């Protein structure tokens, strides 16, 4: 696909921890030659310590992190034709913070059932997220509604390759529709 288009676009990979956000974003970035940023790297030190000790973040904990990701979206839209960012974006209010001042932004919602995600988290090594916090994340999660036209759903209760392929197709389709609209 040719990405020499007159606009820049960022896709945020959202969902609970264990849904495959980083894995899918990295695979899609490789295939599409896109820049990729894991939003976890933008968490303030206190947030990382809090999560590492097994405590969930409050909205006030998340706000500076979400603002940092919003700034990263601006920077990436200024320098890359196609960028992918990993961020849980569990609530509509969080997604709205990310949307502020960004028209070329879409979300890829990696959705899975609790049992599948829990099994993935229990098998994961070297991540500060504690699997017992999954219950809290599912309770916090606000599924995007019909009013969020910039959110695309991918079911992660299928093979990794199927999820990657579905995600790449969505990104290509969104870009293609923008090209057609600008023609």
Task: Enumerate the language-model features and the residues they cover.
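Hydrophobic anchor at the beta1->P-loop junction of P-loop NTPases
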Residues: 13
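Conserved substrate/cofactor phosphate-moiety recognition/catalytic segment
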Residues: 26-71
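The conserved Walker
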Residues: 17
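Small-molecule kinase domains that catalyze NTP-dependent phosphoryl transfer to phosphate-bearing small molecules
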Residues: 123-166
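Conserved phosphate-donor/acceptor-positioning beta-strand/loop module used by diverse small-molecule
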Residues: 101-120, 154
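Extreme N-terminal, non-catalytic leader segments
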Residues: 1-8
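Glycine-rich phosphate-binding loop used to anchor ATP phosphates in small-molecule kinases
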Residues: 60-102, 110
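Conserved lysine of the Walker
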Residues: 21
């Amino acid at each position: 696909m040719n990405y020499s288009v007159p606009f820049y676009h960022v896709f945020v990979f959202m969902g609970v921890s264990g849904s495959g956000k980083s894995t899918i974003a990295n695979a899609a970035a490789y295939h599409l030659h896109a820049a990729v940023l894991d939003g976890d790297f933008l968490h303030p030190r206190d947030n990382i310590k809090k999560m590492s000790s097994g405590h969930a973040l409050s909205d006030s904990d998340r706000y500076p992190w979400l603002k940092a990701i919003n700034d990263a979206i601006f920077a990436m839209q200024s320098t890359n034709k196609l960028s992918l960012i990993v961020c849980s974006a569990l609530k509509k209010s969080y997604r709205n913070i990310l949307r502020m001042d960004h028209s070329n932004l879409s979300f890829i919602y990696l959705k899975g059932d609790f049992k599948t995600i829990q099994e993935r988290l229990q098998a994961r090594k070297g991540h500060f997220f504690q699997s017992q916090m999954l219950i809290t994340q599912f309770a916090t999660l606000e599924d995007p509604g019909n009013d969020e036209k910039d959110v695309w759903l991918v079911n992660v209760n299928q093979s990794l390759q199927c999820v990657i392929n579905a995600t790449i197709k969505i990104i290509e389709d969104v870009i293609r529709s923008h090209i057609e609209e600008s023609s």
